[in-house]
UniProtKB/Swiss-Prot annotation:
It comes from the Bacteria. Its cofactor is Mg(2+); Zn(2+). PANTHER family: DNA-DIRECTED RNA POLYMERASE, DNA-DIRECTED RNA POLYMERASE SUBUNIT BETA. The gene is rpoC. It comes from Ureaplasma parvum serovar 3 (strain ATCC 700970). One of its GO terms (molecular function) is DNA-directed RNA polymerase activity. The RNAP catalytic core consists of 2 alpha, 1 beta, 1 beta' and 1 omega subunit. When a sigma factor is associated with the core the holoenzyme is formed, which can initiate transcription. Mg(2+) binds at residues 527, 529, 531. SUPFAM superfamilies: beta and beta-prime subunits of DNA dependent RNA-polymerase. Its EC number is 2.7.7.6. GO terms for biological process: DNA-templated transcription. Keywords: DNA-directed RNA polymerase, Magnesium, Metal-binding, Nucleotidyltransferase, Transcription, Transferase, Zinc. This is DNA-directed RNA polymerase subunit beta'. Binds 1 Mg(2+) ion per subunit. Binds 2 Zn(2+) ions per subunit.
Length: 1305
């Protein structure tokens, strides 16, 4: 422990002495509480003398009551006078009458259990011995036949199974005959003497009885007899296992196994694998300081009584924790066994009782591992201690990683357009509840801020509470004062990324709904159709400072996943801004335009108003001299602080003047978005230019849409101080709402364009479909080919319809159509909606089991009869039925996808949670070579070179093609430099990457580069692992579930796409045979490609190393990627499809694997229009590929098969070389997301992910020490996390919070 909490945590196997040390007393009675007095029974499971008093400072018998007796122990009832909370931490114990094996060490599927590995007997044999089925040899004695010992030590005698019992019985009979022969020799074969010898007669009798397989007597007698004569000792039960473990010499065993591994001819056979497992286990126990026999317990601990409470229900009934039932059973059986032992009961009865005791203890520790778990009255298995640890409802995930918190509430959200960006409206009722302690403290305050005495509003807490309850008028000024002291934190579930939790300054509102600022809805993914949000209150000074400086909504301008503005206005606001920035010719000219455009342009000058100031122009609009969208002129001098390309008359509209007033004074005037970047110089008529000529050629500019407005906000963020952006956004929001109201945009079914062209297309396609049907019936086409062509035909028809509709809505006729305006501005709707409303619904999907797709068949997941009608026309009955089919599939897909995507996000977070920015520069000289990602099929760009290198550090100095310096090595590549690199024709750039960062834990600032959410160098302490996982997981729900098929002929590649593809890549799942690409294992040239008549596929022959050849057969429907004469490298695709990552690692190395995964992940996301920075994918991949498996330990002390991180391996190898020792060798590994978290080196983090039991068993066996490097481990133990402000001083955090508070407007 230290000032800052726990420094590290070790887990090990508890020794009997340790258990006694924990315990405050032995429990001998199974009773819980007295049914009359409801007090705990002495010596029972709730005994107060062991676990502490039930009531604070009050003993069992009532002799001592009150805190003044604290620390005394009552002479009568032996209860210590203390607080009752000790009942949560004090433990008891049960002394077992017979040793019991710990189920975690005997049953550990799928791998062999620890006891089985230590004793080198099979898992099944351990089980049989422990459960009193079979005997085990403890000592082979001097029992020899043919020069060999009949029994081997640790040999298990199977006398129960008909198959194996013959061999064991024969061995026993052989031993009995040995005894007979020895007695015969002693008595010189005298018949009389032999008949009278009791032992001889007994040996003969036992021998005869053992002939029969159904042994009708206790074998124990035979074994006792054999032991007496030969010294061979047999044992059964946990007692026998314990004795063998006690006698185990770990040092000897270790050397023996090492020798056996060295002598093993095959390093990969099952025998060697088991030897390696044994070596690992023996070394763990040897190095841990634990003794193997501690795996078999002679006493068990009893958990504190408050952790397994007994609760009284109505009607005098009780309910209790399942744990109590287990303990009760153990105590009853244990006490019964003690009595039997005291009365010298027969061995067979004792063994039976010991087995029952073993089973009772097993069910306490792990009820579900048993074949027949102990069930309750309702026939459900009772929850054992293992169940309390694992799963979502277990201790780790339910109680340690996520807790319910006080000072919180939740309510429905409604929009609050009047709020500032950092404000939230909290209902008065909620404020009274949440801020109650602060309000009361203010009401009873006797001194003011300066320390002067004042008259309190309420004399005491009780009166203050009454005033709050009555909602007295006197409390409201106090409430207003109190809520200014601290912000509140808002959270909307599901919290898919860090912007799902933000802080706001509270503002009291009427009603019961929380009022939310409209601009933050995108970040929360909230809408106002009944969504609820939770409110939390930061209590400590540090928490308040953190909320104000880091969590406040107005600081979150850019989304962390792509660095794009996340507070872009939406819907009504967009509509208002679109209307406000729209340009029109003056009304008279507009009317003329329809009749005579040339004359209208000449007349334009007579209706062109020029103003000298902004106010004058706005006044003219208010007086209705001009309309808000009319093109007008205004002198450039009317705009102070703004720079123009020249002086003169700026051609703009009143709407644009009003819009520009929302921006800071020195911000460029936005007449068109291009103005921001100096393109298309401002529309200014210069001092000596002809106004008439200018106006004649004038074309109306496009208004601002959602997309262009986002560009404006992005630019504003780049050039302004952080506090200016939210102020400007609030002004834009207000303008948006105001002018969407003034625009009076309405919506009606008759606004939808009418369209009839489609029926001609339908006629053509129907004819084609019937032709295809005839071809199929004539046997010219297979059903698969017919289906594919039909679907393709209808898809093309819909494409034509879509194209027509697009042309229609972009035509002049519909430019003022309200629905078209909504779609064009980006407020609501898109072309696909118009196609369905005015054109046709098209083909619908149907349910299809993608997992069972056959090898060569076509995926028939589309109903081949399209829906020809549009929604405006209305659907026919059959069309409605088909469309409901697709709609339902869509709903179920979404539900499935959400769950799967959530699980993937959890796995991503668990894999990367320990990755934090640790230092400024790790000094690595390695990087990754980055090229543009292109889709090789249609040669389109998926991600440009600029997108991939911007915000990263260069490894080498970069020159353009003319040898002119662009950027030096180890310098940041800004957006401008990235543009120059891309335009100079450079195809690839080597940059720093998290994949090659040499920091021992985490990543350095330079290897990561710019923080996408601030556009500044990433700060130390940023938990980029979690941010990367969120950025990849959050859009996961937007990925499609279906497998795209490229349409066209059967045999075109059916490649898994969308979410399933991401899962395949990150979980390292082998692609199915029919979509797996054939890759080259060698570097060479394609010699020839031959058709294989047997398989209908191809044989691709590659020549390598001058005159070596290798042949790659392909499946029948494979699409080739190579042609004769092509140069080919190892790992390159020969056929289309998905590459198996493990094959790629084998033939092309880890770097190619990393590049492949980045490229494929980007392909999936970008094809869905989701932009994610490469850096995040690299952080994830670095965690999947940063482990290495030892193949030869050299002199390092590591062992074969051990998995360690690359950085650790490098350190060990360097030390070996420096000390002139033999370094270890190893191979790279790729782990999927399912296995990566358990390889993190922290058992707490791994156990809270999956396989809790196995991870804790392994960690305890090796006495593992958790150094608490990651975030989860620290959360579990209640430490501050080693990231963000957790690494800073408290004073520093508070000072920063106060500084940022001053920046609020």
């Amino acid at each position: 422990m230290s000032q800052k909490g726990i420094k590290s945590l070790t887990i090990s196997i508890a020794s009997p002495e340790q258990i006694l040390n924990w315990s405050k007393g032995e429990i001998t009675k199974p009773e819980t509480i007295n049914y009359k007095s409801l007090k705990p029974e002495p010596n029972g499971l709730f005994d107060e003398s062991i676990f502490g008093p039930s009531k604070d400072y009050e003993c069992y018998c009532g002799k001592y009551r009150k805190v003044k007796h604290k620390g005394k122990i009552c002479e009568r009832c032996h209860v210590e006078i203390t607080e009752s909370i000790v009942r949560r931490e004090r433990m008891g114990h049960i002394e077992l009458a017979a040793p019991v094996a710990h189920i975690w060490f005997t049953k550990e599927l799928p791998s062999p259990s620890k006891i089985s590995l230590l004793l080198d007997i099979t898992y099944k044999e351990v089980d049989q011995v422990v459960y009193f089925v079979n005997y085990i040899v403890l000592d082979e004695g001097n029992n020899v036949y043919d020069g060999k010992s009949i029994f081997n030590k640790k040999e298990v005698l199977d006398l129960t199974s008909p198959k194996n019992s013959i061999r064991s019985r024969n061995k026993l009979r052989r031993t009995l005959r040995n005894i007979q022969e020895r007695i015969e020799d002693e008595l010189n074969h005298e018949r009389e003497a032999l008949i009278q010898d009791f032992d001889y007669r007994l040996a003969v009798t036992y021998d005869q009885m053992l002939k029969d397989s159904n042994i009708p007597f206790s074998v124990k007698d035979v074994m006792a007899f054999i032991e007496k004569h030969t010294g061979v000792r047999f044992g059964i039960g946990a007692e026998a296992i314990r004795e063998l473990l006690e006698k185990l010499n770990l040092e000897e065993e270790h050397e023996k196994i090492k020798q056996a591994i060295q002598n093993s001819p095959n390093a990969y056979d099952q025998k060697t694998k088991r030897l390696l497992r044994r070596l690992e286990c023996v070394r763990w126990i040897k190095d841990s300081g634990s003794k193997p026999e501690w795996m078999v317990m002679t006493r068990i601990p009893v958990t504190p009584s408050e952790t397994r409470p007994i609760i009284s229900l109505d009607g005098g009934r009780f309910t209790t924790s399942d744990t109590n039932n287990f303990y009760r059973k153990i105590i009853i059986r244990n006490e019964r066994l003690k009595q039997m032992q005291a009365t010298d009961a027969p061995e067979i009865l004792l063994d039976n009782e010991k087995r029952l005791l073993q089973e009772a203890v097993d069910s306490l520790f792990d009820n579900n591992s048993r074949k027949k778990p102990v069930v309750g009255k309702d026939k459900r298995p009772l929850k054992s201690l293992s169940n309390h640890l694992k799963g979502k409802q277990g201790l780790f995930r339910q109680n340690l990683l996520g807790k319910r918190v006080d000072y919180s509430g939740r309510s429905v959200i409604v929009v609050g357009p009047e709020l500032k960006m950092y404000e939230v409206g909290i209902p008065a009722l909620m404020i009274l509840k949440l801020f109650r302690p602060y309000i009361i403290s203010e009401l009873i305050r006797k001194r003011d801020e300066l320390g002067n005495e004042i008259q309190p509003i309420c004399a005491n807490i009780k009166l203050a509470e009454q005033k709050i309850l009555a909602q007295d008028n006197e409390i409201w000024p106090v409430v207003e004062k109190v809520i200014k002291q601290r912000p509140v934190i808002l959270n909307r579930a599901p919290t898919l990324h860090r912007l799902g939790i933000q802080a706001f300054e509270p503002k009291m509102v009427d009603g019961k709904a929380i009022r939310l600022h409209p601009l933050v809805t995108t970040a929360f993914n909230a809408d106002f159709d009944g969504d609820q949000m939770a409110v939390h209150i930061p209590l400590s000074k540090e928490a308040v400072a953190e909320a104000r400086s880091i969590l406040l909504a107005s600081w979150h301008i850019l989304g962390p996943k792509d660095g794009k503005p996340i507070i872009t206005p939406t819907q009504d606001m967009i509509l208002g801004i679109y209307y406000l920035t729209k340009e029109k010719f003056p009304q008279v000219i507009e009317e003329m335009m329809a009749k005579d455009p040339t004359q209208a342009r000449v007349e334009f000058i007579n209706n062109f108003h020029i103003f000298s100031t902004q106010d004058e122009a706005i006044r003219a609009y208010k007086l209705k001299t001009i309309r808000i969208n009319d093109v007008i002129g205004i002198t450039t001098k009317a705009f102070n602080n703004k720079t123009f390309s020249k002086e003169g008359i700026l051609v703009t509209t009143v709407g644009k003047i009003i819009f520009n007033q929302a921006f800071p004074v020195n911000f460029p005037y936005i007449n068109d978005v291009k103005n921001l970047y100096g393109e298309n110089q401002f529309e200014i008529i210069g001092m000596h230019e002809s106004i008439l000529d200018y106006l004649k050629a004038y074309n109306l500019k496009e208004p601002l849409t959602k997309k262009t407005l986002s560009t404006v906000i992005d630019y504003l963020y780049k050039v302004s101080e952080i506090e200016v952006v939210p102020q400007t956004m609030d002004k834009i929001k207000a303008l948006g709402f105001k002018y969407s109201m003034i625009s009076a945009t309405s919506i009606s079914a008759f606004d939808i364009p009418s369209y009839d062209q489609k029926y001609e297309y339908f006629k053509e396609t129907d004819e084609l479909v019937s032709k295809l049907r005839e071809f199929y019936l004539d046997g010219k086409l297979t059903d698969d080919e017919r289906y594919t062509k039909v679907v393709q035909a209808w898809s093309q028809t819909k494409d034509k319809v879509t194209h027509d509709i697009e042309k229609l809505i972009n035509s002049n006729e519909y430019k003022d159509n309200p629905i078209v305006i909504m779609a064009k501005s980006g407020a609501r709707g898109n072309t696909s909606n118009f196609t369905q409303l005015a054109g046709m619904r098209g083909l619908m999907s149907k349910s299809y089991n993608y997992d069972q797709k056959n090898n060569n068949g076509v995926i028939k997941d589309t109903i081949e009869i399209p829906i020809k009608h549009s929604f405006i026309e209305g659907l026919s009955v059959s069309e409605y039925f088909n469309s409901s089919f697709g709609a339902r599939k869509g709903m179920t897909d979404t539900a499935m996808k959400t769950a799967k995507s959530g699980y993937m996000t959890r796995k991503l977070v668990d894999s990367t949670q320990a990755v934090v920015i640790k230092d400024h520069d790790c000094g690595t000289k390695e990087g990754i070579i980055v090229r543009e990602i292109r889709n090789t099929k249609d040669n389109t760009s998926i991600e440009s070179l600029k997108d991939r290198i911007v915000g990263r550090y260069s490894i080498n100095t970069i020159y353009d093609t003319k040898n002119k310096l662009i950027i030096e090595s180890d310098k940041l590549i800004t957006s401008e430099i990235a543009n120059i690199i891309q335009n100079s024709g450079i195809r690839e750039v080597e940059v720093r990457s998290p994949l090659h960062c040499a920091s021992l834990y985490g990543v350095c600032q330079k290897c990561f580069g710019l923080d996408l959410s601030t556009n500044k160098l990433i700060e130390t302490g940023t938990a980029i692992g979690v941010i990367a996982a969120q950025s990849i997981g959050e859009p996961g729900t937007q990925l499609t579930m279906r497998t795209f098929h490229t349409g066209g002929v059967a045999g075109d590649t059916n490649i898994t796409q969308g979410f399933e593809r991401i899962k395949q890549l990150f979980d390292c799942i082998q692609p199915q045979e029919n979509e797996k690409a054939v890759i080259s294992q060698v570097k060479g040239t394609v010699e020839r490609i031959e058709k294989d008549s047997n398989t209908n596929g191809y044989n691709v022959v590659i020549k390598y190393n001058k005159d070596n050849y290798v042949n790659y057969p392909t499946r029948s429907n494979a699409v080739l990627r190579v042609k004769t004469g092509d140069e080919i490298i190892a790992g390159q695709k020969i056929t289309e499809g998905s590459i198996d990552v493990n094959d790629l690692l084998k033939y092309a190395g880890i770097e190619n694997v990393r590049h492949y995964i980045i490229k494929e992940v980007q392909k999936v996301y970008r094809m869905q229009g989701i932009e994610i920075s490469d850096k995040y994918i690299e952080v994830i991949i670095s965690q999947l590929t940063n482990k290495i498996t030892i193949t030869n330990p050299g002199d390092s002390g590591l062992f074969v098969g051990e998995t360690i991180s690359i950085n650790e391996f490098t350190e060990v190898a360097q030390n070996m070389l420096v000390n002139k020792k033999k370094p270890p060798s190893a191979i790279n590994q790729v782990f999927g997301l399912d296995h990566a978290p358990s390889k993190s080196g922290s058992f707490l983090s791994a156990a809270s992910f999956q396989d809790t039991k196995k991870i804790l068993t392994d960690a305890a066996a090796r006495s593992q020490k958790d150094m608490l490097i990651g975030l989860k481990e620290n959360v579990i133990l209640g430490n501050l996390i080693p990231a963000g402000t957790g690494l800073k001083d408290v004073e520093e955090v508070i000072a920063y919070g106060e500084e940022m508070y001053k920046k609020q407007y």
